[in-house]
């Protein structure tokens, strides 16, 4: 890990870090699903982004027994098919996993593909490459799915995909499962997302604390979500801190699980990403920026604090005027901004929008106290509310809606970058 000088943004954090380590959440044992038997036919087919999704696409999958992995693909409009070799990436939960990256693709083009070994194949799936530059699209943002996935979370997830059937990708803000290496829970997650949704759109995922067991990231994580390979020069952050550019939006994943840093080396963990984030934001050709990580900048529930994340990352997010910061962890809904970014109109502010959401049924009691300690204000805050979020990007406007499973809009705003500068206007 590169040596990074102490951050002036992290002054007086020592006591807070000791407290954070002492209060780090423990996962208590209880009955959980076991390994799900992997099928001979390829399953858990998942699209994950590359750095350049206009011309390339990564796909991951698994089977029961080790085979010679292949991907066959062709333009959906017709023409000869191409078969390329994949790579065997590891084993977990009774299955062998594979990955392949298709390159030399044409922008804004539909492709059909299937994965297999040349004899046994998956069904055919379709994906569309990104446009080579800004173009309108929508995406989904899901908070913690984590608990009671099949009965409690899946109905909300399915409602999201039914409502946003034209979404180009999904952002997952961590805690996809409750027990990091429980294959049965991963099976439930894939079932909730659905085969076609997993295999036909990109999934930008950032890990939560429940994707860790102590200092160890889930063995499933790199097999499903390898990242784009452009993150910090730190092996402990591989596949968890990365970025991808999609039609005028730079999506950035950070790993905020500092209490899971090896040997509790919190300073290097957070500062390596701080330095990397500054570089990625300073050299950003896109008009829009979305950052996702699990633990919030401003904690949204009782008994929690975002002070460590604020010390390292808040100034960078504000300096580069990131548009959306999409988070999870607190099992409640909250949306707000720095008080310093208020305007004369109470329904309008400037600067980044910070959101915390939860898709699964586990709930905590929301509070505004940590927002206030961090110099921020809450504009919408909800408890006992499972939501999904649809974000539409079109030219100078970004429109955001948070909805419950029955389609009720519980929060909405629009970011407008036309005219005299950026304005964030409440719509609910």
What kind of region is each of these model predictions?
Residues 99-102, 110-131, 184-285, 312, ...:
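Extended active-site neighborhood of metal-dependent phosphoesterases/phosphodiesterases
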Residues 161-163, 282, 318:
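Non-catalytic positions within long, well-ordered alpha-helices that form the structural scaffold/packing
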Residues 78-97, 140-155, 180, 229-233, ...:
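Acidic/histidine-rich helix-loop elements
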Residues 141-143, 169-175, 203-209, 254, ...:
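Active-site neighborhood of phospho(di)ester-bond hydrolases with catalytic His/Asp-centered motifs
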Residues 4-19:
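Bacterial N-terminal signal peptides that target proteins for export
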Residues 137-206, 211-212:
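Conserved, compact domain cores that house catalytic/ligand-binding motifs in diverse enzymes
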Residues 2-3, 19-21, 27-141, 162-163, ...:
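Acidic, histidine-bearing metal-coordination/catalytic regions of metal-dependent phosphoesterases
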Residues 177, 258, 284-301:
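Short acidic, glycine-rich surface-loop motifs adjacent to enzyme active sites
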């Amino acid at each position: 890990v590169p040596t990074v000088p102490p951050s002036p943004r992290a002054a007086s954090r020592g006591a807070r870090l000791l407290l954070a380590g002492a209060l780090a959440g423990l996962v208590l044992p209880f009955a959980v699903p076991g390994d799900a038997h992997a099928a001979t036919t390829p399953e858990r087919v998942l699209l994950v982004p590359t750095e350049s999704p206009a011309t390339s696409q990564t796909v991951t999958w698994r089977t029961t027994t080790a085979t010679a992995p292949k991907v066959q693909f062709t333009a959906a409009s017709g023409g000869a098919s191409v078969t390329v070799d994949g790579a065997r990436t590891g084993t977990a939960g009774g299955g062998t996993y594979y990955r392949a990256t298709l390159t030399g693709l044409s922008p804004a083009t539909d492709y059909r593909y299937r994965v297999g070994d040349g004899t046994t194949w998956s069904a055919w799936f379709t994906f569309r490459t990104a446009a080579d530059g800004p173009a309108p699209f929508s995406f989904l943002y899901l908070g913690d799915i984590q608990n009671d996935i099949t009965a409690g979370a899946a109905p909300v997830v399915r409602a999201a995909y039914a409502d946003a059937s034209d979404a180009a990708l999904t952002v997952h803000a961590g805690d996809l499962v409750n027990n990091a290496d429980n294959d049965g829970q991963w099976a439930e997650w894939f079932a909730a997302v659905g085969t076609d949704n997993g295999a036909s759109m990109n999934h930008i995922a950032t890990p939560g604390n429940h994707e860790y067991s102590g200092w160890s990231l889930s063995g499933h994580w790199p097999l499903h979500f390898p990242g784009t390979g452009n993150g910090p020069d730190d092996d402990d952050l591989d596949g968890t801190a990365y970025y991808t550019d999609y039609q005028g939006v730079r999506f950035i994943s950070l790993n905020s699980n500092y209490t899971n840093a090896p040997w509790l080396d919190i300073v290097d963990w957070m500062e390596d990403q701080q330095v990397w984030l500054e570089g990625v934001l300073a050299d950003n050709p896109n008009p829009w920026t979305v950052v996702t990580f699990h633990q919030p900048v401003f904690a949204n529930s009782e008994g929690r604090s975002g002070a460590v994340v604020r010390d390292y990352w808040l100034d960078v997010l504000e300096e580069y005027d990131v548009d959306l910061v999409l988070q999870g962890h607190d099992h409640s809904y909250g949306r707000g901004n720095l008080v310093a970014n208020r305007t004369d109109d109470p329904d309008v502010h400037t600067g980044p929008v910070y959101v915390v959401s939860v898709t699964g049924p586990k709930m905590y009691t929301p509070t505004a106290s940590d927002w206030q300690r961090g110099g921020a204000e809450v504009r919408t805050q909800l408890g006992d509310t499972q939501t999904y979020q649809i974000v539409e990007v079109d030219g100078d406007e970004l429109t955001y809606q948070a909805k419950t499973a029955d389609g009720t809009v519980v929060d909405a705003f629009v970011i407008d970058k036309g005219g005299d500068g950026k304005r964030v206007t409440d719509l609910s």
